[in-house]
């Protein structure tokens, strides 16, 4: 019994250390290296500003369309602009914590405390806008449970979080950061494809 205990104790310690390293909300699988994923995640998480331009495709119940995407992020301020999807014309979502506004061409300007409530009320989409801040960088949102699959390069390949499935189909390096260039999101009767043509990452807090 003593020999068995001596053999099992270090194994159990290693298992617990590995689970703690991943964080309480994160389950990781896939061919990548967990330590390399943690290093990549920590590096990309230092980005608190960016400018993105590209294309977006949206499939919703009984409607679909595509358009262009522009996203300016400056720490806790965001300015997300869509033009063309679903025949709505230009749509602009801007704000900071607890103060968000949505402008829809031909309909006016609307305000709410959260981007999720505003988008659902005015566009009818249950879209986790706050999670997109993380997902667009190839990271899980830290405030809820997630199941991750990392690829052979130890980058996020697939994410399941809060009823959404996110697939990362292409990456590229920009200013020393490996960032997603093609993302497919599916959940709550929505399917969204993002194709990022231009990434300009920034570390504003440093």
From Swiss-Prot:
> Residues with S-diacylglycerol cysteine lipidation?
19
Gene name linked to the record: lolB
* Protein name, per record: Outer-membrane lipoprotein LolB
Record keywords: Cell outer membrane, Chaperone, Lipoprotein, Membrane, Palmitate, Protein transport, Signal, Transport
Instruction: State the organism named in the record.
Output: Stutzerimonas stutzeri (strain A1501) (Pseudomonas stutzeri)
Checking PROSITE patterns in the record gives: PROKAR_LIPOPROTEIN (PS51257)
The lipid modification N-palmitoyl cysteine is placed on 19
Q: Which GO terms describe its biological process?
A: lipoprotein localization to outer membrane; protein transport
On whether Protein transport is a keyword of this UniProt record, the answer is yes
Question: Which Gene3D superfamilies is this protein grouped with?
Answer: Lipoprotein localisation LolA/LolB/LppX
Q: What coarse category fits the chief subcellular location reported for this protein?
A: membrane
NCBIfam families, sorted: lolB
The compartments listed are: Cell outer membrane
Q: Describe its function.
A: Plays a critical role in the incorporation of lipoproteins in the outer membrane after they are released by the LolA protein.
What does the record say about its membrane topology? Answer: Lipid-anchor
How is this protein organized at the quaternary level? Monomer.
């Amino acid at each position: 019994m003593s020999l068995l205990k001596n053999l099992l104790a270090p194994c159990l310690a290693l298992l617990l250390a590995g689970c703690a390293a991943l964080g309480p909300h994160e389950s990781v699988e896939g061919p990548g290296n967990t330590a390399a994923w943690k290093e990549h995640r920590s590096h990309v998480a230092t980005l608190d500003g960016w400018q993105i331009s590209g294309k977006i495709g949206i499939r919703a119940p009984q409607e679909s369309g595509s358009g262009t995407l522009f996203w300016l992020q400056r720490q806790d301020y965001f300015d997300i602009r869509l033009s063309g999807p679903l025949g709505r014309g230009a749509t602009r979502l801007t704000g900071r914590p607890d103060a968000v506004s949505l402008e829809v061409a031909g309909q006016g300007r609307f305000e709410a405390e959260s981007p999720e409530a505003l988008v659902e009320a005015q566009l009818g989409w249950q879209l986790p806008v706050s999670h997109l801040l993380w997902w667009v960088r190839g990271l899980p949102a830290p405030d809820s449970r997630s199941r991750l699959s990392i690829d052979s390069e130890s980058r996020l390949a697939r994410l399941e979080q809060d009823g959404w499935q996110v697939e990362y189909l292409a990456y590229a390096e920009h200013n020393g950061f490996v960032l997603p260039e093609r993302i497919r999101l599916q959940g709550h009767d929505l399917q969204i494809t993002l194709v990022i043509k231009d990434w300009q990452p920034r570390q504003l807090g440093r």
